[in-house]
Regions:
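Glycine-rich phosphate-binding loop
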Residues: 96
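Conserved GNAT acetyl-CoA-binding A-motif
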Residues: 109-122
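Conserved active-site tyrosine of GNAT-family acetyltransferases
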Residues: 129, 134
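Conserved catalytic-core motifs of GNAT/GCN5-like acyltransferases
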Residues: 118-120, 135-151
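Conserved N-terminal entry element of GNAT/NAT acetyltransferase domains
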Residues: 1-14, 157-161
Length: 161
């Protein structure tokens, strides 16, 4: 089947939130260590209501990766080039879905005039981003009670253009 990456719509909210919540709970154990307090904080804004507000933000691009009508991943990038979300369904891990979604997020950032993207990676995704051309941009920072948020950036285009 063909993977389609498109702008999220309000009707995606419920399923997209399930994808994000499963991704965090099942794939990010190295980050939350099954600590209920950390999980509760991390999952607290992964609701259909908050998802709807992300869609409506004028300086934000919220994308979904869809295959056969099923949402497999959710990603977001601000107009300033900051990737704020990149979650893949555990059912779609290691199939190139996250790589395709990050490529679309980077393309959107470039459309907005950015020459680099920034993000804060989880421990779980750190090797993925390094393999995707990102470099670490500082000391780890705490996220949701963890100490495993890694500031990273990637040059997208030449500053000499």
């Amino acid at each position: 089947m063909l993977l389609e990456i498109r702008a999220a719509i309000p009707e995606d909210a419920s399923v997209a939130c399930q994808v994000m919540r499963r991704s965090i709970a099942e794939l990010c154990v190295a980050d939350h260590r099954n600590d209920e307090a950390i999980l509760k904080r991390w999952l607290s804004n992964k609701t259909p209501e908050v998802f709807g507000s992300w869609i409506r933000q004028p300086d934000n691009s919220l994308l979904v990766a869809v295959e056969g009508g099923k949402i497999l991943a959710v990603g977001s990038v601000t107009d300033a080039g900051q990737i704020t979300l990149n979650y893949v369904s555990p059912d779609a891990r290691f199939r190139g879905v996250s790589r395709a979604l990050v490529g679309a997020l980077e393309a959107r950032a470039m459309e907005r005039g950015n020459t680099r993207c920034t993000l804060t990676s989880t421990e779980t995704a750190r090797r993925f981003y390094l393999a995707s051309g990102y470099v670490e941009d500082g000391l780890p920072v705490g996220n949701f009670g963890t100490s495993s948020g890694y500031p990273m950036s990637k040059l997208l285009a030449s500053h000499d253009a």
